[in-house]
Amino acid sequence: KIEVMQVSVVENEYEQRAHFEKQYPLSENVQYRFMKSCAGYCVATYVLGIGDRHPSNLMVTSDGRFLHIDFGHFLGNFKTKFGYKRETAPFVLVTQFVAVFGGEESEEFKQFENLCIEAFNVLRANFTLLCSLFTLMISSGLPELRGYDDLKWLYEKLCPEKSDEQAAEIMRELIQESLRNERTRANLFAHL
């Protein structure tokens, strides 16, 4: 069963956690599954440049899996509204999500950060494979993947020339940038 997770910019992180616990009885397994899938979501949407990230496209399963639907915009082809880029954060990560797995000072947040770093470095280690797979899809007719120039996004995001330690620091900065992004809050509010 998949449901829309209502996120309100008015609610504080404790109210959001209470809502989550009411909807999804918060066992350690559910909390851990949410945290792990949120880490996967953050890294995947960043690397693939998934756009149109708003509450109607963010879902939570009854067992705590967090997922994104609607992959119509990718490789950084983000929508604009009235000439403004709607998505300015590397990925959607708000305090309400972090509250579900314990808040920024928790061990679970450190675990989340480490999972993001590990996933990012695994993708970086497989940079050539990813580019090869995307190259095979160029002839598929996808409007946002028409030629080799479209693959620049992957190179820029995966930064294969960096060391794993440098990439870890980049991911930590991306997490903080996403968490502090006020435009994300405004975008979420606009879709309520």
PLM regions: where:
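Conserved short secondary-structure elements within globular domains
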Residues: 43
